[in-house]
Amino acid sequence: MHDIRQIRDNPEAFDAALARRGHEPVAAEILALDEQCRAVTTKMQEAQSRRNEASKAIGQAMGQGNTEKAEALKAEVADLKQTLPRLEDEDRELKMRLENALAVIPNLPLDDVPDGADESDNIEVGTWGTKREFSFEPREHADIGPALGMDFETGARLSGARFTFLRGGMARLHRALGQFMLDRQVSEYGYAECAPPVLVRDEAMYGTDKLPKFAEDSFQTTDGRWLIPTAEVSLTASVMDQILDDAALPMRLTALTPCFRSEAGAAGKDTRGFIRQHQFEKCELVSIVRPENSAAEHERMTEAAESVLQALDLPYRKMLLCTGDMGFGARKTYDLEVWLPGQGAYREISSCSNTGDFQARRMNARYRPEGEKKTAFVHTLNGSGLAVGRTLVAVIENYQEEDGSVAVPEVLAPYMGGAMKLEPTP
């Protein structure tokens, strides 16, 4: 959500920032609605004030024996009581229209975000690791996986397209990866482990900018709750409508949860394999910080996500997203893309975003700076540390052997009960 004062103070700069994201100008429309809203609010407040004054004056007139004046004041109060409900309704409606108009405007990019139209304009800002040289032609995970317990047929039979049933060693490796990620973020980077609900109300989805813009990308239950598309929703919204102590910041939260996405906009993409699923697990990172610390926290969070890939010895590149490829609520985003030798391509495995106070305004999350009476909005950040399913894919493709087996990364040995290889079944 945007600060209306920012638009009032410099509408041209606001529209110019939106134009960098390929968005049409909206300042004039927003300010016209804002002017209507303020005019009606003023009118309503004046009517309320006059009603109170006139009501008080009735008693004074009666005490002075001025019946005629008292009757006139009573008539005025009666008129105001009829007028006020209409003004109050109009005030509520205009405020709702203004909020709805602001709610669908994306966040403004920071100055150091490159301009661009789509992912082809993203900038590579770093790489890590050495791509393995194979003595055989590496295969894709969708070809290797079935013999190792990645059962696409049963998943589809049970639930339809984009669902997978993991068995045996494959299921254990998937679990090991998630536990390793969670343990690392807690022990190495000081994130507090959480186990949040995966069903949330509208308010949590709205506060984390998933509604109303992306309703079709999420699953809703019959009672109106939403299955979380990411634990970002539950973790970030945990401070909704709160005023935090300055000493409580930074607040770093992590959770390993199932996530659910309808993938409405992904028709025809990654229809094969385990890359794009309706249900998947992810180790989510959320930071809630003072405004002056959000830029440094963004770098720290991205480093935390990178550390998992480095520990697993998975080659990757770090991309700074351009204005045209950033998510709706982000003002700056880094994507980590892991190398998949079977596909011969880098694929996104983590996205770390700084949203500034964009989400905090939507969910009214504030803190009280030490020694000050006034509160201020916090800044929120979120990132994947990492997507478990895609990491499983990366391990399969990077650690595959010619016989169809897959070696287990050394750091996962404590989680695998000593099993250091997945062997194909005949």
Curated annotation (Swiss-Prot):
<dbReference type="GO" id="GO:0004828">
    <property type="term" value="F:serine-tRNA ligase activity"/>
</dbReference>
<feature type="binding site">
    <location>
        <begin position="261"/>
        <end position="263"/>
    </location>
    <ligand>
        <name>ATP</name>
    </ligand>
</feature>
<keyword id="KW-0030">Aminoacyl-tRNA synthetase</keyword>
<protein>
    <recommendedName>
        <fullName>Serine--tRNA ligase</fullName>
        <ecNumber>6.1.1.11</ecNumber>
    </recommendedName>
</protein>
<keyword id="KW-0963">Cytoplasm</keyword>
<comment type="subunit">
    <text>Homodimer. The tRNA molecule binds across the dimer.</text>
</comment>
<feature type="binding site">
    <location>
        <begin position="230"/>
        <end position="232"/>
    </location>
    <ligand>
        <name>L-serine</name>
    </ligand>
</feature>
<dbReference type="InterPro" id="IPR045864">
    <property type="entry name" value="aa-tRNA-synth_II/BPL/LPL"/>
</dbReference>
<dbReference type="Pfam" id="PF00587">
    <property type="entry name" value="tRNA-synt_2b"/>
</dbReference>
<dbReference type="InterPro" id="IPR010978">
    <property type="entry name" value="tRNA-bd_arm"/>
</dbReference>
<comment type="similarity">
    <text>Belongs to the class-II aminoacyl-tRNA synthetase family. Type-1 seryl-tRNA synthetase subfamily.</text>
</comment>
<dbReference type="GO" id="GO:0005524">
    <property type="term" value="F:ATP binding"/>
</dbReference>
<dbReference type="Pfam" id="PF02403">
    <property type="entry name" value="Seryl_tRNA_N"/>
</dbReference>
<dbReference type="InterPro" id="IPR006195">
    <property type="entry name" value="aa-tRNA-synth_II"/>
</dbReference>
<dbReference type="InterPro" id="IPR042103">
    <property type="entry name" value="SerRS_1_N_sf"/>
</dbReference>
<keyword id="KW-0547">Nucleotide-binding</keyword>
<dbReference type="InterPro" id="IPR033729">
    <property type="entry name" value="SerRS_core"/>
</dbReference>
<keyword id="KW-0648">Protein biosynthesis</keyword>
<feature type="binding site">
    <location>
        <position position="284"/>
    </location>
    <ligand>
        <name>L-serine</name>
    </ligand>
</feature>
<dbReference type="InterPro" id="IPR002317">
    <property type="entry name" value="Ser-tRNA-ligase_type_1"/>
</dbReference>
<comment type="function">
    <text>Catalyzes the attachment of serine to tRNA(Ser). Is also able to aminoacylate tRNA(Sec) with serine, to form the misacylated tRNA L-seryl-tRNA(Sec), which will be further converted into selenocysteinyl-tRNA(Sec).</text>
</comment>
<dbReference type="GO" id="GO:0006434">
    <property type="term" value="P:seryl-tRNA aminoacylation"/>
</dbReference>
<feature type="binding site">
    <location>
        <position position="384"/>
    </location>
    <ligand>
        <name>L-serine</name>
    </ligand>
</feature>
<keyword id="KW-0067">ATP-binding</keyword>
<dbReference type="InterPro" id="IPR002314">
    <property type="entry name" value="aa-tRNA-synt_IIb"/>
</dbReference>
<keyword id="KW-0436">Ligase</keyword>
<dbReference type="GO" id="GO:0016260">
    <property type="term" value="P:selenocysteine biosynthetic process"/>
</dbReference>
<dbReference type="InterPro" id="IPR015866">
    <property type="entry name" value="Ser-tRNA-synth_1_N"/>
</dbReference>
<dbReference type="GO" id="GO:0005737">
    <property type="term" value="C:cytoplasm"/>
</dbReference>
<feature type="binding site">
    <location>
        <begin position="348"/>
        <end position="351"/>
    </location>
    <ligand>
        <name>ATP</name>
    </ligand>
</feature>
<comment type="pathway">
    <text>Aminoacyl-tRNA biosynthesis; selenocysteinyl-tRNA(Sec) biosynthesis; L-seryl-tRNA(Sec) from L-serine and tRNA(Sec): step 1/1.</text>
</comment>
